[in-house]
């Protein structure tokens, strides 16, 4: 596949409005800055509509919810839909509690999302599949060998692109599905690594035309996975060093290295 959106992110520095969780705010902002995007971290209901007038992308991440956040997310999501700003949903722990289930269902009913990014448990919940997650972690379930089909089914259900992240990532628009075979076992050991991926996807959508969101999302996930591989080189269990290396790699990676390292496979039914 061709890689063209990474350079556009660096050239255009898209302003991304992140309504994300308090655990990952700093890590997400630093990752976006390293990549070349411009994060705007605000969850004030009184200003989120105005922000959509100049933002290029919106991330909604439900990791640490409160009622004010929910209000801000609904207002921002609807405003983004009106102005044509792409919206990414990260339904952290979607099936873990009744409160989260109801909030996610409300968001999906009232906001049009360009991309939904989640782990197997979260995407499985959206598909109605019997996955057993542990808190906000992925867990295992009946469709553990059919992740490609799982991503595809949710993409069809909600008419959007789905990024199912894990040991390998599956990206689907409901018709086409790619498997990204890059990555490292160290990424899940860093709090917020999945949440930052959602933010990176949103940045790539911010420089992409709507008809190419699938390619932009696939490229974002590939950049992320390859950066993780490069950051892990020479490390075993030094997770703190890995986290710093990973931010560095997001800033250093370029299309030539990406094309050389990427292992992206088209899935066939």
Curated annotation (Swiss-Prot):
Substrate binds at residues 41, 192. Its cofactor is Mg(2+). Gene3D superfamilies: 3.40.1190.20. It holds the Pfam family HK. GO terms for molecular function: ATP binding; hydroxyethylthiazole kinase activity; magnesium ion binding. Pathway: Cofactor biosynthesis; thiamine diphosphate biosynthesis; 4-methyl-5-(2-phosphoethyl)-thiazole from 5-(2-hydroxyethyl)-4-methylthiazole: step 1/1. GO terms for biological process: thiamine biosynthetic process; thiamine diphosphate biosynthetic process. Keywords: ATP-binding, Kinase, Magnesium, Metal-binding, Nucleotide-binding, Thiamine biosynthesis, Transferase. ATP binds at residues 117, 165. It is an enzyme of class 2 (transferase). It catalyses: 5-(2-hydroxyethyl)-4-methylthiazole + ATP = 4-methyl-5-(2-phosphooxyethyl)-thiazole + ADP + H(+). Its EC number is 2.7.1.50. InterPro entries: Hyethyz_kinase, Ribokinase-like. Catalyzes the phosphorylation of the hydroxyl group of 4-methyl-5-beta-hydroxyethylthiazole (THZ). Belongs to the Thz kinase family. NCBIfam families: PRK09355.1, thiM. This is Hydroxyethylthiazole kinase.
């Amino acid at each position: 596949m061709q890689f063209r959106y990474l350079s556009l992110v660096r050239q255009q520095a898209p302003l991304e409005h992140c309504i994300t969780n308090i655990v990952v705010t700093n890590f997400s902002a630093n990752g976006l800055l390293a990549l070349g995007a411009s994060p705007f971290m605000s969850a004030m209901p009184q200003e989120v509509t105005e922000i959509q007038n100049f933002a290029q992308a919106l991330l909604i991440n439900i990791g640490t919810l409160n009622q004010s956040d929910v209000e801000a997310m609904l207002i921002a999501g609807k405003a983004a839909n009106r102005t044509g700003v792409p919206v990414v949903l990260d339904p952290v722990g979607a099936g873990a509690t009744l409160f989260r289930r109801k909030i996610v269902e409300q968001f999906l009913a009232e906001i049009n999302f360009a991309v939904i990014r989640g782990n197997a448990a979260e995407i499985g919940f959206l598909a109605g599949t019997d996955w057993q997650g542990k808190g906000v972690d992925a867990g295992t379930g009946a469709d553990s060998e059919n992740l490609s089909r799982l991503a595809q089914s949710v993409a069809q259900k909600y008419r959007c692109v789905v990024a199912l992240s894990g040991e390998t990532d599956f990206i689907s628009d409901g018709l086409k599905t790619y498997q990204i075979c890059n990555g490292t076992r160290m990424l899940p050991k860093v709090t917020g690594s999945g949440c930052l991926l959602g933010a990176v996807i949103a940045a790539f959508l911010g420089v992409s035309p709507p008809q190419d969101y699938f390619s932009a999302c696939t490229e974002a996930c590939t950049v992320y996975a390859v950066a993780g591989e490069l950051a892990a080189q020479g490390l075993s269990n030094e997770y703190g060093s890995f986290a710093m290396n990973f931010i560095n790699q997001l800033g250093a990676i370029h299309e030539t290295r990406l094309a050389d390292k990427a292992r992206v496979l088209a899935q066939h039914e």
